[in-house]
Amino acid sequence: MAVGDVKTAQGLNDLNQYLAEKSYVSGYTPSQADVQVFEQVGKAPAANLPHVLRWYNQIASYTSAERKTWSQGTSPLTAGAKPTAPAPAAKDDDDDDVDLFGSGDEEEDAEAERIREERLKAYADKKSKKPALIAKSSILLDVKPWDDETDMKEMENQVRTIEMEGLLWGASKLVPVGYGINKLQIMCVIEDDKVSVDLLTEKIQEFEDFVQSVDIAAFNKI
């Protein structure tokens, strides 16, 4: 989906729709594409654009120095472009190759019937071999220490030692919460069928020498 000039109301509406099921502009972690769009937006959007507002506040929580370290990404912005309607869905080549009913006279002979059955079987085989979509979620976790003397670097190292099938750790940073105490904010992507969020937070809380509590700051389906 191409997004037009985000300095216009229409462009912001397009961006809000684009971010409805995305945590970031490109991929599962923040990138230079987010920085580009963030600078174009310029200021926090109105509350009637909840997805843009959520994304804007998340990017704004990082410093300029942190943003410069992000990798490149693909921006959806099309300078000066008007929002484009979605292109018609391409026909599935597999479907085009299969004539479900064949052709011929009204009275099909045995050979025509055999050919049709073979085509139906080939079509069913092709459909059954297509990979199923894997449901994933992007999660932002707030991990809070006991006090300002907690070794936050070691706490992050402990959290990242957690390995589960379908779990991928992402970017992290320290966020001040007051009285000299910082919390660890860390991203992860999970496969919904393989990773239980409750089990993941319980495993983090098992590092009781470092961790006081774990909260889910943001949860988005991918």
From Swiss-Prot:
Compositionally biased region (Low complexity): 78-89
Keyword Phosphoprotein part of the UniProt annotation: yes
Post-translational modification note: Phosphorylated.
Keywords assigned by UniProt, alphabetized: Elongation factor, Phosphoprotein, Protein biosynthesis
Acidic residues compositional bias, start-end: 92-111
UniProt region (Disordered), positions on chain: 71-113
Any one GO molecular-function label of the UniProt entry: translation elongation factor activity
Pfam annotation, one family: Arc1p_N_like
GO cellular component, as recorded: cytosol; eukaryotic translation elongation factor 1 complex
InterPro entries: Arc1-like_N, eEF-1beta-like_sf, EF-1_beta_acid_region_euk, EF1B_bsu/dsu, EF1B_bsu/dsu_GNE, Glutathione-S-Trfase_C_sf, Transl_elong_EF1B/ribsomal_bS6, Transl_elong_EF1B_B/D_CS
Its biological purpose: EF-1-beta and EF-1-beta' stimulate the exchange of GDP bound to EF-1-alpha to GTP.
Family, similarity comment: Belongs to the EF-1-beta/EF-1-delta family.
Assembly information from the UniProt record: EF-1 is composed of 4 subunits: alpha, beta, beta' and gamma.
Protein name: Elongation factor 1-beta'
Organism: Bombyx mori (Silk moth)
